[in-house]
């Protein structure tokens, strides 16, 4: 395959390499057609909204590869946030692997195998850049967006497991992108909705937030955080030359790709504007700008970048360095695309599906007290299955109560309703039950759920709480006697719950944070 060099590219073709745009269809629509055929954009970012099934996705990515090669002279980056677990863009027909809950699973090197499984499915579908893993340290229980997307509250554990995910991903030639530099763990604002600040000194940031990135400084790509670090700069890390160039490039010696998080997130869009944010990020040291949604902003960013080249703010020599870096990493993925994607049959591994389920089964953790026991007079209450944060994905089959009703026909199973009527009815009937099993989901952002569960715990000693999103709900509840946790409300976790309640498995997981 003959690929263009930087020297053979036009200015528009070079600038098109700097944008990582999303679009909103399951087919090659007018938005992506315009970007590729008129603006010579060389990359695409896919989401759940682009995915119906594996056959459709392969047809779409094949078309994208063909058109980008035709209009830019080079292969694309087709990227996706395939962290596993709650941040999983592809769900049907492929391996539904776990996210950082692998840190809790009692399976040797589960994180490596997860990275490898995800990469295998991706490369077979023509995707060569995974916006994972999260190397953020899970050290703030009130963080609304990281939480169980992180491996641990221990920076050394995050660094070690992140490295294994990256190595697993490389087995199938998919480039891993560590995020969110210099660290997104210890904040209480979701950067999709506002601008967080991490107000620590340089020593603390280097020793905690930045440590996993320093230990993985050879990762192919690093994504910046839309977070203020006043110790470094007066602008968010994504727009900070001090952070991206002086610290990451020069001080840490990073030679890979620097990506931004989505510039349509409110942390950037509301204060700086999406298109202007793209220009600021490129001038600060970024190579690729993620603009996930809007054609107007995607085009405006390209126009501003062209103006910056023409007026000298973005020297051609600097632009060429960025493009050369991008092309070099694209070419690393080419042998794997040729082996597994171009003109190859589409196939997926049933063994990977079995291993993915086994990892979830082995992550169930008994945090306090005794295991739950079903009797004919057990009441089970499970929460409504909804995505609690913008970054999470909705799954078609996440109704735990519905599944439990089917599996345990004689059991009183109810879906949690956040109403006074529901709460009062349950409280009035507690004496009719031997014990109660309550499922909790992300208590940090569900005040009514916390109040209800605490009322039950106060009135019914024989109660077991099982968290479906990590152990941190533990700190929200009083009078806890029995507490277990899983780490993601996904179809695999639902299957694990069923096995557990049927006494087909015992908890083997271990905590990854201190409670």
Which residue stretches match the model-derived regions?
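Short beta-strand elements of ligand-binding domains
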Residues: 75-82, 131, 462-471
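A charged helix-plus-loop insertion that forms the helical arch/lid used to bind
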Residues: 94-107, 150-152
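Active-site-proximal loop/turn and secondary-structure-junction residues that shape catalytic pockets
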Residues: 25, 50, 82-84, 135-136, ...
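Short, conserved phosphate-binding/catalytic loop or strand-edge motifs used
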Residues: 135-145
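Short acidic, glycine-rich surface-loop motifs adjacent to enzyme active sites
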Residues: 35-54, 141-142, 215-234, 432-445
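Catalytic domains of carbohydrate-active enzymes, especially glycoside hydrolases
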Residues: 33-47, 116-129
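Preference for extracellular/luminal or secreted protein segments
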Residues: 1-40, 275, 279-515
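Second-shell residues forming the walls of enzyme active-site clefts
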Residues: 8-10, 21-22, 28, 49-72, ...
